[in-house]
Amino acid sequence: MAWISRYSMLVVLLGLCLIFSFATLTKQQPNPPDAAEQMLQALRAVTPQRVLVISSNSREDLDFVDALRGKFETLTNKDPSWTVSFVAGTPQDARKAIDGSSSNRLTLVVSPDAQPWKLFEGLAEKFPGKELRFVAPEPVLWPSFLKSQNLINIVNQIVIIAILAIGMTLVILTGGIDLSVGSLIALSAVICTLAIRDWGGGEQADGGTILLCGLLALLVCALAGLVNGLLVVYSELPPFIATLGMMLIASGSAFLLCKGQSIAAVPDSFVWLGRGTWFGLPVAVILMAGMYVATHIVMRSTVYGRAIYAIGGNVEAARLCGIRVRTVIVTTYVLSGLLAGLGGLVMASRLKSGDATYGAMYELYVIAAVVVGGTSLRGGYGSVLGTLVGALIIAVIENGMNLIQIESYMQKVVFGLVILGAVLLDRNARVRR
């Protein structure tokens, strides 16, 4: 039965997905490719005629039009008697297109978001002399939780916490903790955007300048992590106290640098890291996934990874085995600071600005993700993949409760219960081990 304990959090994640799927089951529009196929099948049953595809400018509607355009190209190539045109925009744009049509017989294919337009009520009275046929995708029974865009949003909204949680996992595995990561988010965002504004040309900054300013912010955060590590191993300060002090220093420094004002003088290209997509997926999500894969390999297949587990299990035994305990511990804090800085860059890119208020309370969510993912607060036991599962559990709970309209105050209660439950499970597992 050891596998039950090992994969318990993954089972919890799947269970939560199942619960929220049933809770959000409702009739809704099919995804764009399915809706396009549905429309094509409906039109094949009628006499060839002129077709006008009407849509709004929403993202889902434009995806629907793109999918339908490809299918109509195949259809018109096989049967030239079909004539298809497209209009995207407002009800006024659609009316102009209908009035301007040279054909008296017209089939209107209407996208999901355009269906509620009052333009389509009483078509015969509004367009006398034209024979109009209204065709629209039929709604299907499907959970709002499992819509592809919602699933992407779940992962996308947890990216920053998940990136920080990698470094926090390494620190906690050694028996430490890092409370400064939330403030380092703000410090990183402020330093990067301030450097772009004051030294990099502001809104005219090029890609190379943005990269250098980002590296500067990462360097400062890594140095903050280095100070944390040195205080812990050489001054023998408790990690809680050392990183609490750095949290206050970083937060105060961020406010001093930006003078309490948001810094928004950055170029449009600055948002690529936080909002850009690659092969249909957010760039930040791809970055996060790559980092988790790389860290998992390091922790499972390298001497450094095994040293971290050894230190968390028994510091003295690790030292007697020849492990450079102090060096390893310091590097975990450096990595934690570096990844907190990266999280700050993602947040600044996503919001297209830097602000000293960024990252408030994030350290608690990061620690929660690590603990919920099964990493022991005493060190020596856990994994980064477990941390990813923990971060996803937090994101799924938040997203699911928003979908079923649970108020934010109750969400905090639920998060607190989840954290307490995870710690109790960790305690019981430690007793069994």
Model-derived segments and their meaning:
Residues 1, 172-177, 205, 220-264, ...:
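Short loop segments and helix-boundary regions at transmembrane helix junctions
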Residues 340, 350-416:
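Transmembrane alpha-helical segments in multi-pass inner-membrane proteins
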Residues 239-302, 328-331, 350-359, 406, ...:
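Transmembrane helix-bundle core of multi-pass membrane transporters
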Residues 147-199, 230-236, 374-384, 417:
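Single transmembrane alpha-helix segments in multi-pass membrane proteins
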Residues 210-213, 224, 280-354:
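Helix-loop-helix "hairpin" substructures at the membrane interface of multi-pass membrane proteins
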Residues 10-23, 112, 167-169, 217-221, ...:
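Hydrophobic core segments of alpha-helical transmembrane domains in multi-pass membrane transport
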Residues 1-31, 37-41, 96, 125-129, ...:
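Cytosolic-side transmembrane-helix boundaries in multi-pass membrane proteins
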Residues 52-61, 77-83, 174-176, 180-226:
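Membrane-embedded helix boundary and interhelical linker motif in transport proteins
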